[in-house]
Amino acid sequence: MILITGASGNVGREVVKQALAVGLKIRATFQSPAVAAKAPAGLEGVIMDYAKPETIRAALHGVEKIFLVAPPVRDLPALEANFVKEVRAAGRKHIVKLSALGGRESMFPSGHRDSEENIEASGLPYTFLRPNGFMQNLVNYNAGTIRSQNAFYGCQGNGAVSIIDIRDIAAAAVIVLAATGHEGKSYALTGGESLINEQIAEKISRVAGRKISYVDLPAAELKKGILSTGTSEWSADALIDLQRLYCEGKASLVTDDVERLTRHKPIAFDQFARDYAFAFQDEAKVAS
């Protein structure tokens, strides 16, 4: 039995989909019964709260491997530490942790490093998957202004990023979960090319059928816009700090880890843009 945490999130949902497609026996965790009720057929859904050890213990019963993904919040290391404590008590189970590319130089990956070090110290078998930024973030966070303003915003200047399609992250995760030989290893998961936002805007323009622009803003102005969406202060600061990392060129690394794990090249941004073209349609035309 494989436990997939965060099954309603962007990556967790895709891991569930691909795990079911290859016939893996999985249990998936959800935050509420309402969300669990919408889970696909073929899996066992359970409610789990990282702050409630009894729910973690119930989720771990009979499990051999775990895909661990916690929400991107300030207390991520503490939440995952609670989980790891219960895993140790339940026996020697292999944790496949969704981490992040980068080190201590930025808030978000730094929290993942804390969690990784705790897992290493636990003595449990582990594998760390460290992806770069997600292509799908353009759909989740930027599609609204792309549709309504023909533009998306950031503060990363000309910093290039080897962004990766979530579908490739999930494919790598399923392979690690389904096989042995990955214990004690870390994989840096990136796309096959490093792109600046102007290049991304050009590629989206082609599938959208109109000109889409990238607008670079001062960090303070961008943060103000992020906060206006209801995002927490910490999350806004973490996003701005991550863009600083991008601006400094520290996220441009391209690796072959996706291809080595999955035996296929990473999904190209052009393919991603075609697959998600519906998300970038002109809002005025859709309304008419």
Features from the language model and the residues they span:
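Amphipathic terminal alpha-helices
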Residues: 257, 265-288
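C-terminal accessory subdomains/tails of enzymes that are appended
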Residues: 194, 211, 260-262, 287-288
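Oxidoreductase cofactor-interface core, primarily capturing Rossmann-like NAD(P)-dependent enzymes
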Residues: 1-39, 51-63, 72-81, 85-94, ...
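Conserved SAM-binding strand-loop segment of SAM-dependent methyltransferases
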Residues: 44-47
